């Protein structure tokens, strides 16, 4: 399990909604990843739509997947 120190944070924009609360996110550096919603966002029913600015956490072990931890103002 990754430690908190190993987490990499990126800003991005949701470009597509996929089934099972997965999203395709384009990061600020141009890469596209698949991201899921964090547990607290799911618990509080925070909705994410295409075009939303989000903050994504990734581990250095798999740079193709991430976790959405914050939804910014559109």
UniProtKB/Swiss-Prot annotation:
Q: Which InterPro entries does the UniProt record give?
A: NA-bd_OB-fold, RNA-binding_domain_S1_IF1, S1_domain, TIF_IF1
Enumerate the SUPFAM superfamilies for this protein: Nucleic acid-binding proteins
Tell me yes or no: is Cytoplasm among this UniProt entry's keywords: yes
Q: Where is the S1-like domain?
A: 1-73
- Hydrolase as a keyword of this entry, yes or no, is no
The GO molecular function terms of this record are: ribosome binding; rRNA binding; translation initiation factor activity
Entries under CDD domains matching the protein: S1_IF1
Subcellular localization(s) per the UniProt record: Cytoplasm
Q: Which domain of life is it from?
A: Bacteria
Pfam families this protein is in?
Answer: eIF-1a
Q: Which GO terms describe its cellular component?
A: cytosol
Alphabetical UniProt keywords: Cytoplasm, Initiation factor, Protein biosynthesis, RNA-binding, rRNA-binding
Family note: Belongs to the IF-1 family.
Q: State what this protein does.
A: One of the essential components for the initiation of protein synthesis. Stabilizes the binding of IF-2 and IF-3 on the 30S subunit to which N-formylmethionyl-tRNA(fMet) subsequently binds. Helps modulate mRNA selection, yielding the 30S pre-initiation complex (PIC). Upon addition of the 50S ribosomal subunit IF-1, IF-2 and IF-3 are released leaving the mature 70S translation initiation complex.
Q: Cite the record's note on assembly.
A: Component of the 30S ribosomal translation pre-initiation complex which assembles on the 30S ribosome in the order IF-2 and IF-3, IF-1 and N-formylmethionyl-tRNA(fMet); mRNA recruitment can occur at any time during PIC assembly.
Name of the protein described by the UniProt record:
Translation initiation factor IF-1
Organism from which the protein derives = Psychrobacter sp. (strain PRwf-1)
